[in-house]
């Protein structure tokens, strides 16, 4: 499997303390710092490679968007990161089904629950 150029997952809850601890463990990241209304930023580092991190609270239907802007993460894909986040943070996590191509349904996502249950869902963008 080819590594994703970046990682984006959606968290049903944004427990900042737990999220900061997880990002620190996985990416050697400093705690997230406020970066505007409902936005938080930090940077992680793996093997000397810097990883910009952006959290946007309530990005989509109340879910927070966590974006890791680098291919140099511990996870090859959004799905792998979503599984790790759901297990560690104890919340529902959603992500794309894979690399998006023209003609793909943009509303299809993978839902990962804290107990490891996964399913494909329709998640249309409501604009909220």
Where are these regions (language model features)?
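Acidic, proline/glycine-rich low-complexity IDRs
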Residues: 83-84, 88-128
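Short amphipathic alpha-helices in soluble, non-transmembrane regions
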Residues: 18-28, 81-84
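A common structural junction motif
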Residues: 24-32, 88-92
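Long, charged/polar, surface-exposed segments that mediate recognition or autoinhibition
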Residues: 71-78, 82-87
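A general secondary-structure signal for short beta-strands and their flanking turns/coil
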Residues: 2-6, 61-63, 86
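Short, extreme N-terminal segment that most often corresponds to the first beta-strand
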Residues: 1-22
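Short, surface-exposed coil-to-beta transition loops
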Residues: 49-52, 78-79, 104-107
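Short, intrinsically disordered low-complexity segments
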Residues: 31-75
